[in-house]
């Protein structure tokens, strides 16, 4: 019985640590419709001011998410038609997709570390 109590305490401590490590992230909701050739803007806000790294993933239907951009310092980071923008003071990160194409139709996810 003593070993069961010790095991439960250890499990509780591990769950408490996992719970404390969760960060709240919010993306703009609903589908975004953009004309071909236009700029698509996706936004994400986060709650933890200590967050250091920010990631954007693209997921095509039936496929696994793929990393398309990451950013860790304020300002803009460009990669081809994609630009990630980070403002740590306002706690937001955005993804701009220039010259939108039909192949850009996917689910976009932001993540914070």
From Swiss-Prot:
Keywords carried by this UniProt record: Adaptive immunity, Cell membrane, Disulfide bond, Glycoprotein, Immunity, Immunoglobulin domain, Membrane, Receptor, Signal, T cell receptor
Domain Ig-like: 23-113
UniProt xrefs under InterPro entries: Ig-like_dom, Ig-like_dom_sf, Ig-like_fold, Ig_V-set, TCR_variable_domain
Cystine crosslinks: 44-110
Top-level taxon of the source organism: Eukaryota
Main localisation: membrane
GO cellular component: T cell receptor complex
Subcellular location: Cell membrane
UniProt-recorded Gene Ontology molecular function terms: peptide antigen binding
Protein species of origin: Homo sapiens
Role, per record: V region of the variable domain of T cell receptor (TR) alpha chain that participates in the antigen recognition. Alpha-beta T cell receptors are antigen specific receptors which are essential to the immune response and are present on the cell surface of T lymphocytes. Recognize peptide-major histocompatibility (MH) (pMH) complexes that are displayed by antigen presenting cells (APC), a prerequisite for efficient T cell adaptive immunity against pathogens.
Assembly behavior: Alpha-beta TR is a heterodimer composed of an alpha and beta chain; disulfide-linked. The alpha-beta TR is associated with the transmembrane signaling CD3 coreceptor proteins to form the TR-CD3 (TcR or TCR). The assembly of alpha-beta TR heterodimers with CD3 occurs in the endoplasmic reticulum where a single alpha-beta TR heterodimer associates with one CD3D-CD3E heterodimer, one CD3G-CD3E heterodimer and one CD247 homodimer forming a stable octameric structure. CD3D-CD3E and CD3G-CD3E heterodimers preferentially associate with TR alpha and TR beta chains, respectively.
Record's protein name: T cell receptor alpha variable 12-2
Span of the signal peptide: 1-20
GO BP: any one term: adaptive immune response
Glycosylated residue positions: 43
A Pfam short name: V-set
């Amino acid at each position: 019985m003593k070993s069961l109590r010790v095991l439960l305490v250890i499990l509780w401590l591990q769950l408490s640590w996992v719970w404390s490590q969760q960060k709240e992230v919010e993306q703009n909701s609903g589908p975004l419709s953009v004309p071909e050739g236009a700029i698509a803007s996706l936004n994400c806000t986060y709650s933890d001011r200590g967050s250091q790294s920010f990631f954007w993933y693209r997921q095509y239907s039936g496929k696994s998410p793929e990393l398309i951009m990451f950013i860790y310092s304020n300002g803009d980071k460009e990669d081809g038609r994609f630009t990630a923008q980070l403002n740590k003071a306002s706690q937001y990160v955005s993804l701009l997709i220039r010259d939108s194409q039909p192949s850009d139709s996917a689910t976009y996810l932001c993540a914070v570390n």
